[in-house]
Amino acid sequence: MRVRKPAVAGYFYPAEKEKLIQQIDWSIKHELGPKALQMPKLGEKALGGVVPHAGYIYSGPVAAWLYSALAGYGKPDAIIIIGPNHYGIGAPVAVMKSGVWETPLGRVEVDGDLAELIMRHYKGVEDDFYAFSKEHSVEVQIPFIQYYFGDVRIVPIVVWRQTLSTSRELGKAVATAIREYGRYVYVLASSDFNHYEPHEVTVQKDDMAISKILKVDEAGLFEVASKFDISICGLGPIGALIVIAKELGFGNVTLLKHATSGDTSGYKDETVGYASILFHR
């Protein structure tokens, strides 16, 4: 059995179980956090959403918003996590179709059936364990998933070919796979927003991108990111999520929380933007 060991425990989040639980508790209770483990539902059903993936001390309070919102809809049968491939290693679009992911909170199993369905409907995705070896965009979501939902299965996907066409192809394949799977699935697009600019600039640029996401406009998102040089690391995963939402009829999008690393750290000269955005109907 393939075991994906933690790559960023002790860096992005605590490597010890109790300290990790305390860090997630801190994220929820933080002045920028949701203050509750479970939020009232916005509509009848949720698809998932956009969630940041920085170190917990920076983006944890914002990330907690999406998880607390999803907790209001209940535990899913599986969670698909689509993140960027920051290191550019492995396949252009990679999935891990078997094995487990390990964190200080224990192990979660990959849902092989759902992963196989995605691969069946998109020939551009490859089963590539190596592509995940260093990648934090998926890893940092898993302790939150374990904290909120326990032993739910996951399907990890990372993308370094972040084009509009790739997002559309992947999104349509995932939507088809979810339909055929026939059970309750959440989809997470793991992404931070604008990088390493002053707080005011990051807020302004993020707002332009978020406005396109709220309009369920993947083409507009890619266009504004290119035109205004908005350095969104998970542009492709967000684009895929928008396509999945369109295909499955989740037309309502709600911005739960937007902040920057300057809000959590106090250092506002060079910041990274974070947003939790819920897709629902």
From Swiss-Prot:
Gene3D superfamilies in UniProt: LigB-like
Please name the SUPFAM superfamilies in this protein's record.
LigB-like (SSF53213)
Q: Into which family does the record put it?
A: Belongs to the MEMO1 family.
Check the record and name the PANTHER family matching this protein. Answer: PROTEIN MEMO1
Q: Which species is the source of this protein?
A: Pyrobaculum arsenaticum (strain DSM 13514 / JCM 11321 / PZ6)
State the superkingdom.
Archaea
Q: What is this protein called?
A: MEMO1 family protein Pars_0062
Record-linked InterPro entries: MEMO1_fam
